[in-house]
Amino acid sequence: MDIETQLRMLESRYRAALSAAVAAKAHYLALAGEPSATPNALERAKLAWQKLDARKRAIAARMGEIEELEQDAIV
């Protein structure tokens, strides 16, 4: 698979991960403002948000690595 194809695929995954992370954060913040939310529910929501955010960051890091490879290939 060429570099451009890999980058397009990762960009698509990044957008999906970003959307999921934003939704998970919104869910967590909504629960945090809900007086009837249980501590367990808050913790689960926070962990889900953090997991998705970490995935987003990992994808961004991989995109950076591939872009560096592309620059090295050009030079």
Q: How does the language model describe each region?
A:
Residues 15-47:
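Short E/K-rich amphipathic alpha-helical oligomerization segments
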